[in-house]
Each structure stands twice: as structure tokens, then as C-alpha cells.
């Protein structure tokens, strides 16, 4: 099958530069996605064009400038590096695409099938460990849309999630373990937040997510297959079990929320301050929701989070990097592409 199947890796995307005009263009495409801000089109348009894009691009551009590399966007650079390493290990044609920005999914699929017309199938791997409406779901829908329009005779398969896959857990655990060798007071798992309504909208049962006590613990296969909250809790559970971390030494929080609607709690910035106020002097923070370092890890956690912790009385703040181009992650991702 390998000579008939190609692989498309898909990550989030990034502005082309730190120029506010490029950031504005990127934010428009990202935030106008109906799966990111899931309100009626006219409301979304008014919110984004009337409010957000008049204030956010300048602020976001300043944040991007703090973390921008000479080669470009860290997320793009790191995604390209890991892609090149994986490609050398996989005997299949491969392309890398982004959900938003110039490295579009349409461009990635077109390159894949133009260079390799013999392909009958594409395996698409979203670089998101956990399934969510605003990440994996929108990627799958966009790929299906392009395939139906431009490559209707080709077959599509995809990896929906890998939050509990053994090799991913092993790679995350090994990475974290390397940063826990020195004494620490608390470990905070910070995952990207999502609106609570995204969970209930995707729940195929209509009666489980956030509607029964301890919903993420009560077995419900259909709901949990698309439940971001359940999946991040499972990732955390598997990592702490593997490393033998006591229950009172770690907690879970959610970052990067937007105002105006309930998001998953507790919020990371609140948790960072709370832990410092409770006398935790040495904090380690990890974000397994991201496989490549990006604005949310390098700036939001690495800079803003550190400042918040130190200002609240903390003394040592350790941000664990993402898997990035670590060899065990490269081999894990290559395995997903091969099998």
C-alpha cells in the first residue's frame, strides 16, 4: 500500500511575518473559521471585523516579535524541521500543510497528487494529540472539502487523535522527566482552552459531556472519542503514572481563552498566581497539547506566565519545551505515517 498512499501532515499555521498587516490577515482567516468562533456568520463577522481586527493585530504582532526567529515563525520552522526528519524515515510521498496561512491544505494536497499522480489514497495526520472542534475537526472538514472538490477519486484516511498512544506518552514522559531532576514544588499541565459549548456540541450522545457528574471519568466511548477535556485528563493521567508523580504535586489548567463565554477551567494564569500565593516557590509547567513550540508556549507561558509567577512570589519557573524535533517524537510520528 505504501507506494499508493501519500501522507499529509497538518499543523495550525502562522502569520507570514510580525508585520501587523500580516498578523491581521492571519487572524481574519483563523477567527472567521466557523469552528473557532462558532456563532452565526453575521455575528462572527461583526465581532471580528468590527472589534477584534481593530485592536488585536497590533497587540499580537508585538507578541510574535518577542518569539520570532531569524528563520521565521517558530511553529513553521519547527514543523518543517520535524517534517524533513520524518520524511527520511518513511517510504511514502509526504507534504506539510497548515490549516491557516500560505501553506494551505489545498496547496499541500495539490503538491502531493501532482508530484505523485499514481497515489490512490492520502493519510492525513493533524499534529494535534487531542481532538477538538477548533483544531482537528476543522482540519478534517477542510481536507474533506478540498478532496471532494479537486480529488474526488482519491481515498482519504486520517488519524483522529493520539492523546493516549503509547509512544506519544513515552516521548512526553521522557521529555518531562528530564526537567524534573531538580527539586520542584508543583507541576502544572497547561492545555489550550476551548469554550465549554464546544464539548456539548460535539457530544454525539447529547447527554454526557458536562451533563453528568465526573463526565470525563464515567466511561462513554462515543462521547470520549471527541471530548477534548476527557482526552487531556487521560494524557495527564498516563504521564504522571509513568513518572510516579504524586497526586498532590500536579494539577491541570487551560490557557489562551477569549472573553465573553465560559471556557474550560481552571485558567492557567489564575492557577499560576494561586500556586505562588500558596507558597509554591518552584513551578514546572508543561503543555502537551502542542507538539511544536509556538506563540502560546514561548510567549504566553514562557514570558507572561513566568512574569506572573515571579511577581506573585514564586522563585523558579521552568517551562518544559514541546516535543519539537526530538528523535523519539520523530520516530513516533514516522510510525503514525507508516502504519
Predicted features and spans:
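Active-site-proximal alpha-helix that buttresses catalytic centers in soluble enzyme cores
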Residues: 2-339
Amino acid at each position: 500500500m505504501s507506494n499508493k498512499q501519500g501522507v499529509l501532515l497538518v499543523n495550525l499555521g502562522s502569520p507570514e511575518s510580525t508585520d501587523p498587516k500580516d498578523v491581521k490577515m492571519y487572524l481574519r482567516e483563523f477567527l472567521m473559521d466557523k469552528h473557532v468562533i462558532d456563532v452565526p456568520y453575521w455575528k462572527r463577522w461583526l465581532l471580528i471585523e468590527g472589534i477584534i481586527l481593530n485592536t488585536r493585530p497590533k497587540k499580537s504582532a508585538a507578541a510574535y516579535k518577542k518569539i520570532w526567529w531569524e528563520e521565521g515563525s517558530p511553529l513553521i520552522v519547527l514543523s518543517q524541521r520535524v517534517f524533513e526528519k520524518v520524511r527520511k524515515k518513511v517510504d511514502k510521498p509526504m507534504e506539510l500543510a497548515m490549516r491557516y496561512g500560505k501553506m494551505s491544505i489545498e496547496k499541500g494536497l495539490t503538491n502531493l497528487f501532482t508530484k505523485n499522480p499514481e497515489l490512490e489514497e492520502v493519510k492525513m495526520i493533524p499534529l494535534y494529540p487531542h481532538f477538538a472542534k477548533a483544531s482537528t475537526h476543522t482540519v478534517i472538514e477542510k481536507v474533506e472539502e478540498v478532496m471532494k472538490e479537486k480529488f474526488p477519486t482519491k481515498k482519504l484516511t486520517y488519524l483522529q487523535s493520539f492523546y493516549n498512544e503509547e509512544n506519544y506518552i513515552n516521548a512526553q514522559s521522557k521529555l518531562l522527566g528530564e526537567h524534573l531532576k531538580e527539586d520542584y514544588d508543583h507541576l502544572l499541565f497547561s492545555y489550550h482552552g476551548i469554550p465549554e459549548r464546544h464539548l456539548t456540541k460535539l457530544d454525539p450522545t447529547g447527554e454526557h459531556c458536562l451533563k453528568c457528574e465526573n463526565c470525563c471519568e464515567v466511561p462513554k466511548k462515543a462521547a470520549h472519542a471527541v471530548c477534548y477535556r476527557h482526552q487531556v485528563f487521560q494524557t495527564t493521567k498516563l504521564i504522571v503514572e509513568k513518572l510516579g508523580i504524586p497526586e498532590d504535586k500536579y494539577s491541570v489548567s487551560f490557557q489562551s481563552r477569549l472573553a465573553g463565554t465560559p471556557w474550560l477551567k481552571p485558567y492557567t494564569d489564575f492557577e499560576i498566581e494561586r500556586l505562588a500565593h500558596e507558597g509554591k516557590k518552584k513551578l514546572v509547567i508543561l503543555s502537551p497539547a502542542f507538539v511544536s513550540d509556538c506563540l502560546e508556549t514561548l510567549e504566553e507561558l514562557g514570558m507572561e506566565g513566568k512574569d506572573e509567577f515571579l511577581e506573585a512570589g514564586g522563585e523558579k519557573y521552568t517551562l518544559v519545551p514541546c516535543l519539537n524535533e526530538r528523535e523519539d517524537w520523530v520516530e513516533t510520528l514516522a510510525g503514525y505515517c507508516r502504519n
